[in-house]
Amino acid sequence: MGHKVHPIGIRLGISADWNSKWYANKAEFAGYLAADLKVRQVLRKKMSQAGISKILIERPSNAACVSMHVARPGVVIGKRGEDIEMLRKQLSDIMGVSVHINVIEVRKPELDAQLVAESVAQQLERRIMFRRAMKRSVSNAIRLGALGIKISVAGRLNGAEIARSEWYREGRVPLQTLRADIGYGFSEAHTNYGVTGVKVLIYHGDIFSFSSVGQEKQDDGSRGDRNADRSSRRSREVR
């Protein structure tokens, strides 16, 4: 059942947060949504060499804030900040308000699901064997502290006539545990044989407090007491 829904969408408000944060009435909603999609499309196309992990968009009153999580911030900023200033003007024209850009560096790209997916896709485009690409990315993630990782590729693998899917996993990837901090990434490799899809799931641990929805932090002792209470209630019901 864990594969039937989007792993981030089902966790929104529980252990994951929204990528766009703003309020709009009926008349403005469609315009804001179209502008957000256009901004993401422009950034991923223009800054494809920067290694973009995710793009967060916020709209305070009469302004906008775009936060980019990238592996190579120097590509975005450019020489003496010239590139980021040109990018800010372009985004201001798209959104129609003043735009502030934050560039946040991803310290460990081997633990970022989106960057891992793009890395595997790039290796497939360079005709590297898909099993070697998957195992290399999995071993790097586990070595740097990931509790679990799963990579799946689908398409005409190694130029086969019939498309198929293959996956490789190490550690735990609890898809049905909503408190699990799971990163999800997807990318496509455009090869001579067609398009190959790459999906990556990385498990970082459990989240017991999520500030965006005001949940209180729970320690292991309280969880143990609560589980003991549940088991005692079940035993009484059985009797």
Swiss-Prot record:
One of its GO terms (cellular component) is cytosolic small ribosomal subunit. Keywords: Ribonucleoprotein, Ribosomal protein, RNA-binding, rRNA-binding. Residues 216-239 have a biased composition (Basic and acidic residues). The keyword Chaperone does not apply. CDD domains: KH-II_30S_S3 (cd02412). Residues 39-107 form the KH type-2 domain. GO terms for molecular function: mRNA binding; rRNA binding; structural constituent of ribosome. Residues 214-239 are annotated as: Disordered. Transmembrane segments: none annotated. GO terms for biological process: translation. Part of the 30S ribosomal subunit. Forms a tight complex with proteins S10 and S14. PANTHER family: 30S/40S RIBOSOMAL PROTEIN S3, SMALL RIBOSOMAL SUBUNIT PROTEIN US3C. This is Small ribosomal subunit protein uS3. The lineage of its organism: Bacteria, Pseudomonadati, Pseudomonadota, Gammaproteobacteria, Lysobacterales. The gene is rpsC.
